[in-house]
């Protein structure tokens, strides 16, 4: 039995393409059919954003990208349509724009307990689908408790910045790799795939890596 193929994914909780890319990658991995080991890494698209951003996601987009509110609305409508095509029901009207550093710390907390993928999925769904706040410690603790974590221990960890160094290390590694946007997939430590590519693309790269590994044995 061959070892699983390692896939490292840089991603942000409030990146709409990261959730879409997650679904497309999952479809590609299923299509590939072999063993794949996924690890998520922190990437902050807007580290200067306050925890409680005053304004709507459209206000944020317009400010951040230097575009009009009409253009921002068009962008969100486009991405909502693409999300729907992979089974995701985005609700931009309910989104709480925030700072995601604590959400990233929580993902590392979950990783230490062997449940990183569950926590990542819950946070993405909370942000884009459920209209939950993913920047405040109390809200994050609620979300963690919903999937079985000890709420008080999550609060303790986040208040102590227990995994902040891990978040910073991920961000530093992204810079070292030259990653300038997410999602970004590093497959088998050597192939980089940028953006929410189609499932076929992921399946093909995974198959290529499997064949290369087999040929090298």
Question: What are the residue ranges of the model-derived segments?
Answer:
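C-terminal cap of thioredoxin/glutaredoxin-like
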Residues: 2-36, 40, 107-217
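Structural alpha/beta surface segment adjacent to cysteine/selenocysteine redox centers
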Residues: 22-127
């Amino acid at each position: 039995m061959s070892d699983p193929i390692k896939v490292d994914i840089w991603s942000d909780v409030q990146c709409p393409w990261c959730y879409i890319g997650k679904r497309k990658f999952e479809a590609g991995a299923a299509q590939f059919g072999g063993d794949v080991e996924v690890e998520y890494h922190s990437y902050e698209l807007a580290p200067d954003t306050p925890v409680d951003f005053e304004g709507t996601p459209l206000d944020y987009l317009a400010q951040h990208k230097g575009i009009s509110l009409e253009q921002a609305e068009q962008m969100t409508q486009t991405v909502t349509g693409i999300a729907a095509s992979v089974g995701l029901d985005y609700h931009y009207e309910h989104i709480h724009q925030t700072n995601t550093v604590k959400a990233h710390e929580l993902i590392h907390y979950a990783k230490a307990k062997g449940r990183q993928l569950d926590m990542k999925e819950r946070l993405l769904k909370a942000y884009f689908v459920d209209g939950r706040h993913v920047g405040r410690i109390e809200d994050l603790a609620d979300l963690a408790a919903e999937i079985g974590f000890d709420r008080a221990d999550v609060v303790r960890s986040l208040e102590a910045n227990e995994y902040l160094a891990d978040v910073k290390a991920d961000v530093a590694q992204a810079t070292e790799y030259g990653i300038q946007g997410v999602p970004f997939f590093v497959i088998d430590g050597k192939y980089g795939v940028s953006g929410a590519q189609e499932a076929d693309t992921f399946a093909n790269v995974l198959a290529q890596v499997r064949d290369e590994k087999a040929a090298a044995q």
